[in-house]
Structures are given as C-alpha cells and as structure tokens.
Amino acid sequence: MKKRSAALAVVIVLMSHHIAAADLPVHEVQVLAGKFAFDPPTIQVMTGEPVRLVIRSKDTVHGFSIPKLKIEVRIPKGGDPVIAEFVAPSPGRFEIACSEFCGSGHGQMKAALISVAPVTTNR
C-alpha cells in the first residue's frame, strides 16, 4: 500500500507540474542548423516554462539532440521545420549536439541550452 501511495504522490506532483506549465505562455525559439553550427549557439529558457524549438537546416540533414532532456529530432535538408517541445525540469546547462553525421566538422557541432530558475520576489 505504501508503494502505491508513493507512486500516486509522484504522479500527482508530475501532473500538477505539467498543468502549471500548460498555464504559462510558450517560449518559442527559432534554431538554424548548418555549416557545423547551431544558431543561436546558446538558448536560454526559464525552468518550468513550456519551450517550443522550431529547428531548420540550411544545408544538409542534421540531428538535434539534448541527451539529458531526452530530446532527439532529425532535421531534414531543405528548410522544412521540425518542432521540439519540452519543459526544462531544473536549472542548469544542457549540451546540444548534432546527432546525424553531417561532414568533417560534425563533432564540433554543439550548442548549449541554459535553464535558469524563475526569479521570485518576497513581498
């Protein structure tokens, strides 16, 4: 019974976090992949806010991966957008990498997602 109660408590906490995030406006960021770089090279978001990345390639097929957030999308060549939506669960720096071999500079195709805690005021 204790395990079931603990599991239910976890589900309720996760659901309340999801519902709270759903009430916030979506932070949309346009990301361009090409020539062994992501633009912008650093993306800053608020912890707990819904984020929508609209990712396009300006040259060949790329991947967009944030392993710690379990985000993995394939970006086709031709400029068609791919959407990645998520909520950063905690403050921190998360590495972004190209996960599709795209040429000699593939290993250096990295960027960063910075999640910052919301500022709270005590009045």
Task: Report each predicted region and the residues it spans.
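Positively charged n-region of N-terminal signal peptides that target proteins for export
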Residues: 1-5
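Bacterial N-terminal signal peptides
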Residues: 6-17
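Extracytoplasmic/periplasmic copper-protein system
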Residues: 20-32, 52, 82, 87-89, ...
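N-terminal targeting signals for Sec/Tat export/insertion, comprising classic cleavable signal peptides
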Residues: 30-58
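Beta-strand-rich interaction surfaces with strong enrichment in secreted/lumenal proteins
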Residues: 41-43, 70-75, 85
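Short tyrosine-centred short linear motifs in exposed loops/low-complexity segments
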Residues: 48-49, 88-94
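Histidine- and aromatic-enriched segments that form or immediately flank copper-ligand environments
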Residues: 59-78, 104-111
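Short, aromatic- and glycine-rich surface loops/edge beta-strands on solvent-exposed regions
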Residues: 96-100
